[in-house]
Amino acid sequence: MACLLLAAQHCVASDFDFSISDGISNSKLKEKMEKNVISMLSIFNSREISMNFMKKGITEDAKICISELLQNTTIKYSSVTSSSCIKTISGYQVRGVPVNLESADYEEAGQNLTIDFTPDGDISNVSISIEKKTYSQIMNDVSSQDDYLRRQQIVSFVEQFRTAYNRKDMPFLNSVYSDDALIITGRVVNYFIRSKNADENIFMHKEKIEYNRQNKFQYLNSLQKVFRRNEFVNVKFEDVDIVQHPKYDDIYGVTLKQRWFSTHYSDEGYLFLMIDFSDSERPLIQVRTWQPYKNNKGDIILQDNDIFSLSDFHIVR
């Protein structure tokens, strides 16, 4: 796995600032987290690449994550931002740090980052955030404290999952799909039917969604080829909906609208993930489906009641 190490000694950190507004009472820890974020954002704004990445304040995994992201897109930060701090199972988190992904289309360039920290305040992960409105809807629709923590975990999982496509991180994607995962991908096909009037030799144009079934290894092999063909990949998730299985409380269904942008291809469709949290430290995707939302003319061809959900799959244990 290639890894870039970056230096920020030539970047002027005073051009921008970052602060944590609330959510943490330990002032020394708060200050450390703020300094670590500012150092990282300075690196984003530096065009220089060297062997002198952040020497402290960041984990090795986070270095790899950021390096892979920067290999595929240029990230620029130019704001003064204040974010709340959220306590998580594994440490702390700040959300909504605004950046521009300069390789993306203009309309999609403006994004926000989610930054995770260890209990000691070191940066442990960076991912591209889901929309603030979507996050609030997900976290407000909870039934218990356990459900809140699980939803928090699911949001982090979904954001890391999305960012893995932007990073072209095949090892991560290989690790989150179950070896027995079911992959279903839809595509729009055109066909013609003859008029019911026997006296008329008229054929009418129709469209339907045709589905292709793959296993994990077939899907990842195809994805690897897509990554190689495209200089950049930018995946955006919208309208995220999370549903807990009525019988198995460690199974969740996640439905979302996915917008895919890359060097040579773009599309829009609905993604469904059935995620198994029976091992909470290593959640696995058991089912992944993708259905096109519109045809080439921009007409909607997928109706709401045709979108895959938990009820479409039978779980055997």
Predicted regions and their residues:
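Short, low-complexity N-terminal intrinsically disordered segments enriched in polar/charged residues
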Residues: 11-48, 122-163, 167, 175
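Short, charged N-terminal helix-start/capping segments
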Residues: 25-33, 82-97, 181, 186-188
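Short, well-ordered alpha-helical segments enriched in acidic and aromatic residues
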Residues: 31-70, 168-196
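Short beta-strand edge/turn micro-motifs at domain boundaries
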Residues: 104-150, 247-255, 261-317
